[in-house]
């Protein structure tokens, strides 16, 4: 029923839209997802026509800083703390900004390696979302999942996402998402499986430094100091060497 994370990564590399579903106890919704580097006007049009939700650009903090984007509210009181920034538009190369072509151009402009804040204007018709540094290991949201998949597939560090709605305006869930995926021949995966994939493939700690300490008259110990990549907290391993 659900595709493997490896399959989704392959789709991302090929520039094929896929679906990511979050936990039943969270939103329990599916988003159309694709690395931002693979976006074009046809994919934007598909999202707008068949996804029907808000088309957003998931980015990391470095990109948000390069674009000088501030959060939409100074105090985020949304239930899931989705990090919306002010909306954006490409400063050049667009007309009204809302067409599929214009929105694709805005996204391509925003993800350029050497982009600066002067290259975009605000407000606009693309809604950036800032992912947590730890990705889905820190927040199990579509924003983080889109950025994680982009990174894992070697397609940059940004993703385009769009919620999937039913024709009657309700949010597509469960069997509706499965049937939707079959209808459009899209692979569908769970964010919980992406979390498991990363936990299996990655180390969550890094060695910062090693020190030697002497305790008492003759006991010598090696002190290894590790840092948790998710929260920055340090952990110490004390090893007796003599």
Annotated model-derived regions:
Residues 1-242:
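Catalytic domains of riboflavin
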């Amino acid at each position: 029923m659900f595709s493997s994370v490896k399959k989704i990564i392959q789709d991302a590399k090929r520039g094929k839209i896929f679906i990511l579903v979050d936990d039943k106890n969270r939103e329990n919704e599916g988003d159309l997802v694709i690395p931002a580097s693979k976006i074009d006007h046809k994919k934007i049009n598909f999202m707008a026509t068949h996804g029907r939700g808000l088309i957003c650009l998931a980015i990391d903090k470095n990109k948000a800083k390069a674009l000088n984007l501030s959060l939409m509210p100074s105090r985020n009181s949304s239930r899931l703390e989705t990090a919306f920034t002010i909306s954006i538009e490409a400063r050049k190369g667009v007309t009204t900004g809302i067409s599929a072509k214009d929105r694709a151009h805005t996204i391509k402009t925003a993800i350029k390696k050497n982009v600066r804040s002067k290259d975009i204007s605000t407000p606009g018709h693309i809604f950036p979302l800032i992912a947590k540094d730890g990705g889905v290991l820190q927040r199990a949201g579509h924003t983080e999942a889109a950025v994680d998949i982009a990174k894992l597939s070697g397609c940059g560090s940004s993703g385009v996402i769009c919620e999937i709605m039913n024709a009657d305006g309700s949010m597509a869930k469960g069997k509706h998402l499965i049937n939707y995926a079959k209808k459009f021949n899209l692979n569908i995966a769970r964010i919980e499986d992406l979390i498991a994939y990363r936990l299996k493939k990655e180390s969550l700690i890094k060695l910062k430094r090693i020190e030697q300490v002497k305790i008492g008259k003759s006991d010598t110990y090696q002190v290894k100091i590790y840092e948790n990549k998710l929260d920055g907290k340090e952990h110490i391993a004390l090893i007796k060497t003599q």
